[in-house]
Amino acid sequence: MAIHLYKTSTPSTRKRAVDSQGKSNPRNHLIYGQHRCGKGRNARGIITAGHRGGGHKRLYRQIDFRRNENNIYGRIVTIEYDPNRNAYICLIHYGDGEKRYILHPRGARIGDTIVSGTEVPIKMGNALPLTNIPLGTAIHNIEITLGKGGQLARAAGAVAKLISKEGKSAAVKLPSGEVRLISQNCSATVGQVGNVGVNRKSLGRAGSKRWLGKRPVVRGVAMNPVDHPHGGGEGKAPIGRKKPATPWGRPALGIRTRKRKKYNDNLILRRRSK
């Protein structure tokens, strides 16, 4: 990832470092408009996800997470910026005339070829079932349900590791540190997701954050008692309770939010590291 550092010509450009990947203006059947609504509200108009709203209009790029063009080689034509995710995407032209977007694997360049299938080479960008991937291989875009498409390790710089195989399942170490059992028939893509330096970005000003559709975060102690359990008091007062709470009065910071009895508890061999 190329980071563009701004000169300190104004206060808003001081320490500003943004992604310099070129923004294309594609027009094909893989791109369509989307109606974004809600602004973090539910059907009743109540805020359920805070600090959301506004932002620039976006066109959605349809990404091929299934990689079901089996045994047909494709060539990387472009590497593009996607406003809907922090990873880059690649436009692939397959030999049969099909065009699809995929997540950009780290190290992939324009002109490289990729392929999907069961007996394809273990090469960066190729997709194949876990049963045909050697142990210790770095993978991403991992399926959980066969045929549904990749759902795990899709963020920028994300990478998982295939650590063992036993019976019909394979143990995969996910980016969070969780070790999970996945069917060996599920597919995954070899390599790491590109744009690994995304955490080095510094927007530098509040307006750039608003372009992304993220609104300001207000501390609970700065609110009134009617708005937050931490609110109220004379002057700069503490939260006024033993433990912090959410705006709805539930315990916060350190409380487990995962359901105690979930259908896939037996598939998780080790919980994620905090």
UniProtKB/Swiss-Prot annotation:
Q: What InterPro entries has UniProt attached to this entry? A: NA-bd_OB-fold, Rib_uL2_dom2, Ribosomal_uL2, Ribosomal_uL2_bac/org-type, Ribosomal_uL2_C, Ribosomal_uL2_CS, Ribosomal_uL2_dom3, Ribosomal_uL2_RNA-bd_dom
**SUPFAM superfamilies for this protein:** Nucleic acid-binding proteins, Translation proteins SH3-like domain
Q: Name one GO cellular component term.
A: mitochondrial large ribosomal subunit
Give an example GO molecular function. rRNA binding
Sorted alphabetically, which SMART domains does this protein's record hold?
Ribosomal_L2, Ribosomal_L2_C
GO annotation terms (biological process): mitochondrial translation
Q: Where in the cell is it found?
A: Plastid, Chloroplast
Q: What is its main location?
A: plastid
From the UniProt entry, list the residue stretches annotated as the region Disordered: 1-33, 223-265
Q: Which UniProt keywords apply?
A: Chloroplast, Plastid, Ribonucleoprotein, Ribosomal protein
Keyword Protein transport part of the UniProt annotation: no
* Superkingdom of this protein's organism: Eukaryota
A Pfam family the protein falls into = Ribosomal_L2
Self-association state and partner proteins as the record states: Part of the 50S ribosomal subunit.
Regarding protein family, the annotation reads:
Belongs to the universal ribosomal protein uL2 family.
Q: What is this protein called?
A: Large ribosomal subunit protein uL2cz/uL2cy
Name the species this protein comes from: Pelargonium hortorum
Phylogenetic placement of the source organism = Eukaryota, Viridiplantae, Streptophyta, Embryophyta, Tracheophyta
